[in-house]
């Protein structure tokens, strides 16, 4: 395999522009490309005009709602309604830009997209996305204190039943709190006392 014509970029002032990189027997032409140093195993080549590529304009795309615009604690969730999605400034530059930052390696740069600045957007008079409560779609936001906490007491009152008479000869059982319907006793054979009732009926004695 012939030696590659890639030059290591250990110093920027000695890096000549490359026109071709040969792999195997098939020459492949890459115009205006630079090769990474030999410490990178994959021999990846980048465009040397990445500075112009990173400065290209893109449309404004705001994906997250700003919590400062909606601070009502009664609503748990809020929907983000888009205003003007593609907002551009008067100088034909969008509110979202991509900037190039140098990595730890001196051979490559990474493009990082910066979010929209709401201050400059408001000063230019453009409409940005805002957070609106979900109640605008027809779903009301109930207050936090709307949960009823008396289910436990009602259920407890309807399930407790005891015999009020202390006379062992008495066979009538009545509920402690008159919330559930009156329990009905089943007919039993003479001489057998029914036990205390439960909610909705009586227990038959075990034979």
UniProtKB/Swiss-Prot annotation:
Interacts with hair keratins. Belongs to the PMG family. This is Keratin-associated protein 27-1. The keyword Repeat applies. The lineage of its organism: Eukaryota, Metazoa, Chordata, Craniata, Vertebrata. PANTHER family: KERATIN ASSOCIATED PROTEIN 3-3-RELATED, KERATIN-ASSOCIATED PROTEIN. In the hair cortex, hair keratin intermediate filaments are embedded in an interfilamentous matrix, consisting of hair keratin-associated proteins (KRTAP), which are essential for the formation of a rigid and resistant hair shaft through their extensive disulfide bond cross-linking with abundant cysteine residues of hair keratins. The matrix proteins include the high-sulfur and high-glycine-tyrosine keratins. Keywords: Keratin, Repeat.
């Amino acid at each position: 395999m012939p030696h590659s014509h890639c030059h290591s970029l250990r110093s920027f002032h000695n890096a000549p522009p490359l026109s071709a990189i040969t792999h195997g027997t098939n020459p492949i032409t890459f115009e205006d490309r630079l090769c990474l140093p030999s410490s990178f195993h994959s021999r990846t080549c980048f465009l040397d005009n990445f500075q112009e590529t990173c400065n290209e304009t893109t449309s404004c795309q705001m994906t997250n709602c700003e919590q400062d615009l909606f601070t009502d604690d009664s609503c748990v969730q809020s929907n983000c309604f888009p205003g003007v999605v593609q907002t551009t400034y008067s100088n034909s530059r969008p509110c979202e830009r991509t900037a190039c930052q140098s990595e730890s390696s001196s051979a490559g740069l990474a493009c990082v997209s910066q979010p929209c600045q709401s201050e400059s957007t408001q000063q230019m008079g453009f409409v940005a996305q805002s957070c609106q409560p979900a109640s605008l779609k027809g779903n009301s936001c109930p207050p936090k204190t709307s949960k009823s906490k008396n289910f436990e007491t009602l259920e407890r009152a309807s399930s407790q039943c005891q015999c009020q008479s202390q006379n062992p000869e008495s066979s009538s059982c009545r509920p402690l709190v008159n919330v559930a319907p009156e329990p009905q006793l089943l007919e039993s054979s003479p001489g057998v006392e029914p036990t205390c009732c439960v909610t909705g009926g009586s227990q038959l004695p075990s034979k």
